[in-house]
A protein has these predicted regions:
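Intrinsically disordered, low-complexity regulatory segments in ankyrin-centric signaling systems
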Residues: 1-28, 37-40, 198
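Ankyrin repeat domain, specifically the short helix-to-loop turn at the C-terminus of the second helix
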Residues: 23-31, 56-64, 89-97, 122-131, ...
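Ankyrin repeat A-helix N-terminal signature
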Residues: 12-17, 45-51, 78-84, 111-117, ...
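A generic tandem-repeat structural signature
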Residues: 56, 60-114
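Conserved ankyrin/ankyrin-like repeat signature
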Residues: 21, 54, 86-87, 119-120, ...
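Ankyrin-repeat-protein effector appendages
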Residues: 1-9, 148, 165-166, 175-178, ...
C-alpha cells in the first residue's frame, strides 16, 4: 500500500469511527497529522463526525490537537461552534491552545456566545482562562456577539450574565463606538440591558 493510500484509509477510518482500522493504520506508520485536500487531519474529521472513541485514541497517540484546516476548524473550535459538550470534555484535558482563531477572528468562546451555547460557555469560563474580552476581526467581543447576533432570549440572557460574572467588560464598544448597553437597547433587549446596568454599564 502506498503512503497516500494509507492516509486515505486512515482518514476514512476516522470519519467512520472504525477504531480498529485507525489503530492498524497507526501501526503501519501513517503520519498521524496527515491531511486531506481541505487540510483536515484525522482528529478534525473524527471531531466533525462525533467519533469520540477515535478522538480519544488520536489524542492518546499524540495527534496535534491545535492544527487547523482550511476553514480554521480544529477539535476545540469545533466543540465550541457545534455545541458539542462531549467533544469539549475530551479535548480540554489535552490542553488545547485557547488562542487559536476561527475564520472570523474569534476565540472559542466567541461563536459559543453568539450561538447561545450556554453549557459550552459555562464550561469554558469554569475550566479555562480563555480571554472573555477578545476582539474578533469585525471588532466584536463575545459579549457584543451574544447581544447583537441572536434573539435576546433566555439563553442569550444567561450567556450575557455568565460573561459579565466572569470578567467581560461591559464598556468595550464595537468598532463604531457603540456600547453593549446601547446595542441591547437598540434591539429592544430589555432584560439584557438590565443585566448590563447591574454590572455597571
Amino acid at each position: 500500500m502506498s503512503a497516500n493510500e494509507l492516509v486515505t484509509e486512515f482518514l476514512l477510518a476516522a470519519e467512520q469511527g472504525n477504531i480498529n482500522a485507525l489503530k492498524a493504520c497507526l501501526d503501519k506508520g501513517v503520519d498521524i497529522n496527515a491531511t486531506n485536500r481541505q487540510k483536515r487531519t484525522a482528529i478534525i474529521i473524527a471531531s466533525l463526525n462525533k467519533q469520540y472513541a477515535c478522538v480519544e485514541h488520536l489524542i492518546a497517540a499524540g495527534a496535534d490537537i491545535d492544527k487547523q484546516d482550511n476553514t480554521c476548524f480544529n477539535p476545540f473550535l469545533i466543540s465550541c461552534l457545534t455545541n458539542d459538550l462531549t467533544l469539549l470534555r475530551i479535548v480540554l484535558p489535552a490542553g488545547p491552545d485557547l488562542d487559536r482563531l476561527t475564520r472570523f477572528g474569534g476565540v472559542g468562546i466567541t461563536p459559543a456566545s453568539e450561538k447561545g451555547h450556554v453549557e459550552i460557555v459555562r464550561e469554558l469560563l469554569a475550566l479555562t482562562d480563555i480571554n472573555v474580552n477578545h476582539t474578533n476581526f469585525v471588532g466584536w467581543t463575545p459579549l457584543l456577539e451574544a447581544i447583537v447576533l441572536n434573539d435576546g432570549g433566555a439563553k442569550q440572557q444567561e450567556i450575557v450574565k455568565l460573561l459579565l460574572d466572569n470578567g467581560a467588560n461591559p464598556h468595550m464598544t464595537d468598532k463604531y463606538g457603540k456600547s453593549p448597553l446601547e446595542l441591547a437597547r437598540e434591539k429592544g433587549f430589555h432584560e439584557i440591558a438590565e443585566l448590563l446596568l447591574a454590572a455597571g454599564a
